[in-house]
Design a protein with these regions (language model features):
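Conserved N-terminal catalytic core of the sugar/cofactor nucleotidyltransferase
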Residues: 1-14, 18-20, 27, 31-98
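Glycine-rich, phosphate-binding/catalytic loops in enzymes
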Residues: 19-23, 113-116
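Conserved core of the sugar-phosphate nucleotidyltransferase
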Residues: 57, 104-127
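Short, well-ordered beta-to-alpha junction loops that form the rim of enzyme active sites
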Residues: 100-102
Length: 127
């Protein structure tokens, strides 16, 4: 399973430009970031979102077409607490890959018991 953690709203930098939005909903080209993220895994994909976020109809249709399951999380949880909540709520017993909602990879070779690290070219306040 691929869990995309996107249960906090984006930082002020992005809010000024795109409005109150989650990192995985940021536009990239003519798509949402989650559309690229979902293609990184052949496994089931789950996207965590704040429980006070209303997903619009267009995005719901895209998410359904991509077979992305949504899980809604309290937005005031820390990243670790949010991940733990998702693991417990989804009853995950198999492999789990975690991708942060603001992360873009054109391709990614997800291996069991591994950690991927990437250099940051530009920095901003993390969600």
């Amino acid at each position: 399973m691929l869990l995309i953690t996107s249960a906090k709203y984006s930082s002020a930098d992005f809010t000024l430009e795109f409005g109150k939005i989650m990192p995985s909903f940021l536009p990239l080209g003519n798509k949402r970031l989650y559309e690229y993220q979902a293609k990184l895994s052949k496994e089931k994909v789950v996207l965590s979102l704040p429980n006070n976020f209303k997903v619009n109809r267009c995005d719901l249709e895209k998410l359904e077409k991509l077979n992305i399951k949504l899980i809604f999380v309290e937005p005031n949880l820390s990243l670790g607490e949010s991940i733990l909540y998702c693991i417990n709520a989804l009853n995950i017993n198999g492999n789990l890959s975690i991708l942060h909602g603001d992360t873009f990879f054109s391709n990614l070779d997800l291996k069991e018991d591994s950690l991927c690290v990437s250099a940051v070219r530009e920095n901003y306040e993390w969600a």
